[in-house]
């Protein structure tokens, strides 16, 4: 809605509350989120360019400004230095890399957690980096408001970023045409009447855009090689912990 008001880049940092029953070492019910939405002019890769540059700047800044603090963390929680190169692969290339090394992955389904970690290891071996991005995810693995690939509607204009074999953010080009948005919602079995206000917002005119949401505690966890995300939050909240 803000982009409809001709603000072409929107950034927000703040608390996020997610009532998700995910008892894992990488999920929290409360965390600090960095949300980004932006207009692009020629191709949704413009979003990937900005995000990649942002992450690289963050990682380089941590090394330059907080080397002393990172050393202290490493004394209690030893970790390998984070390797960062700007590597971009298509989802199909990721599937091929897995297949070439004897791992099975359906090209029209999302990566399993196990295959995410395996692919992260293979990417590190091949490209010498702990940071990379995959783009062009299958349509079956994305929500209804994700723009389809204009050349193959089995895939989408979407992307994930990874650190040490774990996803740190998912994003995509959003559908900005109200008629197509309603059609995709109906295709997914969502009653259009229940989201009519959302669809109506695009009737005022909205440029092509996309973005993502990033959980900063997970970024810290993976940068420092910490096994449990609860170590990265002062007062962690998960489905079984409300206090202190």
Regions found by a protein language model. Name each.
Residues 1-244:
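Class II aminoacyl-tRNA synthetase catalytic cores and aaRS-like
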């Amino acid at each position: 809605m803000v982009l409809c008001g001709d603000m072409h880049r929107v950034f927000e940092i703040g608390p996020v509350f997610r009532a998700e029953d995910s008892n894992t070492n990488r999920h929290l019910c409360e965390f600090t989120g960095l949300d980004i939405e932006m207009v692009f002019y020629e191709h949704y890769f413009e979003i990937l360019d900005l995000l990649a540059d942002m992450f690289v700047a963050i990682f380089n800044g941590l090394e330059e400004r907080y080397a002393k603090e990172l050393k202290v963390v490493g004394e209690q929680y030893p970790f390998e230095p984070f390797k960062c190169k700007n590597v971009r692969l298509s989802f199909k290339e990721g599937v091929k890399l897995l297949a070439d090394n004897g791992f099975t992955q359906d090209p029209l389904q999302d990566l399993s957690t196990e295959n995410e970690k395996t692919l992260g290891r293979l990417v590190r071996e091949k490209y010498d980096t702990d940071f990379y991005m995959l783009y062009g995810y299958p349509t079956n693995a994305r929500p209804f408001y994700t723009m389809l690939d204009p050349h193959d509607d089995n895939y989408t204009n979407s992307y994930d970023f990874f650190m040490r074999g774990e996803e740190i953010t998912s994003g995509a080009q959003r559908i900005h045409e109200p008629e197509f948005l309603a059609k995709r919602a109906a295709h997914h079995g969502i009653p259009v009447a229940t989201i009519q206000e959302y669809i109506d917002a695009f009737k005022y005119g909205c440029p092509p855009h996309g973005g993502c949401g990033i959980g900063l505690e997970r970024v810290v966890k993976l940068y420092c090689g910490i096994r449990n995300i609860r170590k990265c939050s002062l007062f962690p909240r998960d489905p079984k912990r409300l206090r202190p």
